[in-house]
């Protein structure tokens, strides 16, 4: 809780919720394993009050996705890989992605150009909203109990990435999807 004084900008009253260049440089020097970076990312997300919810559900999942995807590894990579030592260039890439995520508050999906919807991967960037919607569950449940019969036509209008249309086409292969 912050008590603001009249005439004092909010930005001056709140604690710094960004990562300093010195801290990131120290991390690049000292953190050498995937596990180190995942732990550091979680601490940064929590310490800087980073909103989680554009494709991951908690700071650990967000950190795992950030580190592993930046390294071009699967999010479901074997746990043994967590002790792998990173090259300086890999550490720099993670630090830069983390800086953008924390300091610029860029959603991770935009930084990775990847979001999942209904279990399907989609390329995303700043031109579309990050796909996340309870509609994915409705599609998986085949819109039951609202639709009793297979739909013959499905229209996805102005939803951005087209993820709803693609997920519907996969779930209802006999329907015409526009």
Task: Place the predicted regions along the sequence by residue.
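SAM-dependent Rossmann-like transferase core, predominantly class I methyltransferases
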Residues: 82, 92-178
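N-terminal auxiliary segments of SAM/dcSAM-dependent transferases
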Residues: 5-117
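Aromatic (phenylalanine/tyrosine) cluster motif
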Residues: 1-2
């Amino acid at each position: 809780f912050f008590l603001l004084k009249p005439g004092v900008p909010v930005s001056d009253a709140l604690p710094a919720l960004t990562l300093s260049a010195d801290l990131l440089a120290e991390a690049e020097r000292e953190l050498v394993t995937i596990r180190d970076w995942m732990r550091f990312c979680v601490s940064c997300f929590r310490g800087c009050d980073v909103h989680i919810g554009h494709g991951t559900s908690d700071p650990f999942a967000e950190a795992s996705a950030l580190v592993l995807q930046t390294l071009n590894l699967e999010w479901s990579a074997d746990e043994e890989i967590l002790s792998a030592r990173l090259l300086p260039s890999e550490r720099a890439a993670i630090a830069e992605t983390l800086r953008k995520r924390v300091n610029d508050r860029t959603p991770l999906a935009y930084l990775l150009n990847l979001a999942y919807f209904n279990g399907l991967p989609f390329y995303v960037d700043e031109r579309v909203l990050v796909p996340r919607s309870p509609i994915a569950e409705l599609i998986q449940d085949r819109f039951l109990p609202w639709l009793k019969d297979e739909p013959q036509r499905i229209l996805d209008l102005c939803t951005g990435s087209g993820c709803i249309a693609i997920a519907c086409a996969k779930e209802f292969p006999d329907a015409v999807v526009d």
